[in-house]
Amino acid sequence: MNLSFLMEKRHSYFISMILLWTSFSLVSQSSCAQNQEKIICNGIPWFDDQGKIVNAHGACIVEDAGRYYLFGEYRSDETNSFVGFSCYSSDDLSNWKFERIVLPIQKEGLLGPNRIGERVKVMKCPSTGEYVMYMHTDDTKYCDPCIGYATSKTINGEYIFQGPFKIGNEPIRMWDMGTFQDTDGTGYLLIHEGDIYRLSEDYHSAEKRLVKNMAPGGESPAMFKKEGIYYFLFSNKTSWEKNDNYYFTAPAVGGPWKKGGLFVPEGKLTYNSQTTFVFPLTHGKDTIPMFMGDRWSFPH
């Protein structure tokens, strides 16, 4: 199975793709033409059940009760400011239904007017059954970063913004972020340059920073586990320009972490993308890590 997709981003275009970690092979245009109902290819937009372009950027996918839910930034070409986070659902990762804007712009605060909201990630907390959403908030000059969180009783319901995400009494004031949920239900917050925080039992705060500054200069963090080994993906910092992304491995989330090099052939520039998420696709008795990457362009 190979899946890939295109979406629009900010003032710019945003291409995401889902690739099997084991092969990294892209779907050809001819195979797309033969399987238009089930495969979405790079280079063309997605359309939802309403015939509109899927607007979900910096995205993640969550599987819940046999259905897939795509969360992302709902973007406008008119402004870079936060508009809302969108949710789409699918039973085949190909045909998507627009659910709603699950978290709209707030009247004030971290996600109020003239603020940034990016890299939304959602996990279901196993101890409470609650759905917890995480995001990078900021001002429009990226000078006031803070990780925020929101909660909902249903995966596609209205999320209530709870404010800054903290360790102890201190907000975590960082930029690029991601999340990872281990097979035992433990949740983790991932930060650019390689900080890893273990979440509290209710996922509402961080209880401990396990790793600090693993990858200086790294951003767009994502993690997955395969056959007992943990993989941590990063991109280099090259502003809007694409680069060859790389990875670390470890026998445990707390380390020790060892740099493993590039995870796509050198010079391919991660298929012109930047890491955003790795979705654990359940396939029979196996779980297949599926890479999701953003393709950036600026200003349009």
Identify what each model region corresponds to:
Residues 1-36:
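Bacterial Sec-dependent N-terminal signal peptides
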Residues 7, 32-300:
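Carbohydrate-active catalytic/glycan-binding domains of CAZyme proteins
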